Amino acid sequence: MKLAEALLRALKDRGAQAMFGIPGDFALPFFKVAEETQILPLHTLSHEPAVGFAADAAARYSSTLGVAAVTYGAGAFNMVNAVAGAYAEKSPVVVISGAPGTTEGNAGLLLHHQGRTLDTQFQVFKEITVAQARLDDPAKAPAEIARVLGAARALSRPVYLEIPRNMVNAEVEPVGDDPAWPVDRDALAACADEVLAAMRSATSPVLMVCVEVRRYGLEAKVAELAQRLGVPVVTTFMGRGLLADAPTPPLGTYIGVAGDAEITRLVEESDGLFLLGAILSDTNFAVSQRKIDLRKTIHAFDRAVTLGYHTYADIPLAGLVDALLEGLPPSDRTTRGKEPHAYPTGLQADGEPIAPMDIARAVNDRVRAGQEPLLIAADMGDCLFTAMDMIDAGLMAPGYYAGMGFGVPAGIGAQCVSGGKRILTVVGDGAFQMTGWELGNCRRLGIDPIVILFNNASWEMLRTFQPESAFNDLDDWRFADMAAGMGGDGVRVRTRAELKAALDKAFATRGRFQLIEAMIPRGVLSDTLARFVQGQKRLHAAPRE
């Protein structure tokens, strides 16, 4: 079996559903094998950042491996930012890079695409991946592939594989199973017992769920765990959309001073806060009204569980959830606490200008009228804060890393592995300038996302923190006018009535991407972003309790 074929089969066997990429001369042999064997569908895009974002989204959507293939140097370095974001947000993207042949560096000449040395790229990716391998030895390649892919699955973070172009067709053995990761069964049982004891002894326990629950495909089991625990459930900012289909869905999303006051009180006054799969990031917790004392929480994350001042190591989240379920009898109790979050509805379809919350109401009205909720791919900015108030079938966004440019390629990547389900993308004009042009690939890829573009001709979120800076002003690019040339339909809307009509048409039209360019006056923010900004200013102006 050829090395490239063995790698592709190993990826498919481990759940990968597609490969996103852009070829280059050092990667041409690998792409040839990928195209001819069709082991994984190959989806090419226009710029490497989008390749990384699309692979990230495919991994998030399917709770499995995403695959991004690029050429050496000029291609791989272009994808560093997207992979760094995937690392930060625990998305298992497999980066495959072509490379110079094993003897090409021996001629005494510098090779095109190389950085400082031929090894520079490998060293750069060591900083943003959890396992790496250069597949330059056919005898060792299968074991190296298994080791690296096993790390991606166990740790839910990106990994890096580099294939010299003269090794692509080398004969190798099939790739075996992933190496076993250590789990101390006695420690796992003791940990589960201690977690349950802490939750039972608390007077105000709360379960807070975050991204690892989805990354490891545990939503159904965690929904059952929440039911058996019978405690209030909330999500983090990054976990928004988790357990949406659970019998008793979460009460809402914790955003500290920017969010629902009752949820904020519930979380911050809890004496038994169970942070399940939660990233302890500033976007999740820096806007707390009162500083949460992590010494009084239970934190399960990154194959470890911390209670107070001690930590259980080598505790996989899936194993912990199973052990907790074994220690709890089945229950049909409903979760205690307030009513679930009430989404804004009732758009007034009139001649008034569009505000971000009008977009949320327009989307929610369609769902209330019987439209099946769509998964939302959101970019960074007020579009993400507005999405927090939309009814959805899941939300993916760079909520922690907070990079721009994720939204459009993420929507493309998600729909490519969705089995035909449509994706709703929300994006600002600043981020659209970066990666929105990837929509030109939708016709060739056979997908038709709906894209709502928040156009205020501004880096508006940056303006909220530094309003005096003129560099926040952007020009009006008239994005909707360009949609037809890229194979889609575009419409610019300025009023709430036009917004409703455009959204109705977009949902009714299949086979072409739909771009709704919603013109929003500068300075008009979603309710959630406005509270977030006010809360940040208040917190920075006065010491915390």
Curated annotation (Swiss-Prot):
Residues that, per the record, bind Mg(2+): 429, 456
Cofactor: a metal cation; thiamine diphosphate
Enzyme Commission code(s) on record: 4.1.1.74
Pathway: Plant hormone metabolism; auxin biosynthesis
Cofactor note: Binds 1 metal ion per subunit. Binds 1 thiamine pyrophosphate per subunit.
Gene Ontology molecular function: any one: thiamine pyrophosphate binding
Positions annotated to bind thiamine diphosphate: 48
Keyword Magnesium: yes
Annotated spans, Thiamine pyrophosphate binding: 382-460
Catalytic activity: indole-3-pyruvate + H(+) = indole-3-acetaldehyde + CO2
Keyword line: Decarboxylase, Lyase, Magnesium, Metal-binding, Thiamine pyrophosphate
Protein's GO biological process: aromatic amino acid family catabolic process to alcohol via Ehrlich pathway; auxin biosynthetic process
Cellular component, GO, one term: cytosol
UniProt record similarity statement: Belongs to the TPP enzyme family.
Name this protein carries in UniProt: Indole-3-pyruvate decarboxylase
Gene expressing this chain: ipdC
